[in-house]
Amino acid sequence: NRPGCDNYMEPYDMENAKVAVQTTIREAANWKLVIENNRECYHCNGSHPELLKTLLEWDDVTDPRASQAFKDQVAACTSAWDAEKIPYAHASFGLRNRIVRMPLLDGTVSMTMDGKQGSKKLMGRIKNPDLGSMRILHLPHSWNHCMGDHLIVFTVWPISAQETLVTTKWLVHKDAVEGVDYDVARLREVWDATNDQDRRLAEENQRGINSDAYQPGPYSKTYEFGVINFLDWYSERMLNNLGEESAHVRKVAGS
């Protein structure tokens, strides 16, 4: 937990959280493709009907695609966040770490099928369940959604050149009682569906790349900036790891 993240995590009191359920799926796709699929959100509208019952399309009011209604909703939510002393200012620690808090779809408070609380017992010191979702990106292998009632933690691990494990953990307050405060099937329903949809997308991308007919194309700076940031971070890490040998690679890349 980086020092810069501490104040963002404080309201959730992670020392008093527990894992309600955990799943791991195997994807027949390269680890890098799995991360790129997560960083690219243009596919969401056509691929994730369950997730879009609560998740808004944008996560930044400066996004040129963001509607005025979205900007107005964010502005309205900040007063509630301020009242509960919930941090929400965007924070980035280079390209590797990013934190952003955004509201969920108006009228919903959690990533469940009906948008209602997945756990009756709220996390940490939180009193208001309608705090949207705090999203934490940690390259190279983790993204997270933190809501008032539960958190969802994702980790991605390569196991071969074209196989990846994706583990998802749903965390609730340590005193929440299964069958009383939360139902495991309901808690995991949205992301079980979303993970399987993302698995299919990553595997289809892998099959396409394996084809002799494959040709890479450009990324959109508007719709795919998350992928571009990931690739910039990844490329820089690889070059740094090469040390002196990277000079030739940098020269070729810049030519």
What are these regions (language model features)?
Residues 1-255:
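C-terminal catalytic domain of Rieske-type non-heme iron oxygenases
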